[in-house]
Amino acid sequence: MNTKEPHKRLVQGKVISKFAEKSAVILVERKVVHEKYRKIVKKFKKYTIHDENNQVKVGDFVSAIECRPLSKTKSFTLKEILVVGV
């Protein structure tokens, strides 16, 4: 039997808020080319992530991986802290 591991999204961003126990909000920036004007535009999106050990602080640059929905807004868990206190 050939079991395939499901593809999970990996996002990297800066922690902008630590509002509750085991939760944090990260801001992910991506660059896209504007369809009409062909200019590179920055787009931002906020993700609520699950931090099981309460180890992130505001300003850290972290990596998060997609998981099953943990609450209404949380679908990502902390994978690793890339840079402490950016």
UniProtKB/Swiss-Prot annotation:
HAMAP family: Ribosomal_uS17_B. This is Small ribosomal subunit protein uS17. The keyword Ribosomal protein applies. Pfam families: Ribosomal_S17 (PF00366). Signal peptide: none annotated. Keywords: Ribonucleoprotein, Ribosomal protein, RNA-binding, rRNA-binding. InterPro entries: NA-bd_OB-fold, Ribosomal_uS17, Ribosomal_uS17_bact/chlr, Ribosomal_uS17_CS. PANTHER family: 40S RIBOSOMAL PROTEIN S11 FAMILY MEMBER (PTHR10744), SMALL RIBOSOMAL SUBUNIT PROTEIN US17M (PTHR10744:SF1). One of its GO terms (biological process) is translation. Belongs to the universal ribosomal protein uS17 family. GO terms for molecular function: rRNA binding; structural constituent of ribosome. Disulfide bonds: none annotated. Part of the 30S ribosomal subunit. GO terms for cellular component: cytosolic small ribosomal subunit. It comes from the Bacteria. One of the primary rRNA binding proteins, it binds specifically to the 5'-end of 16S ribosomal RNA.
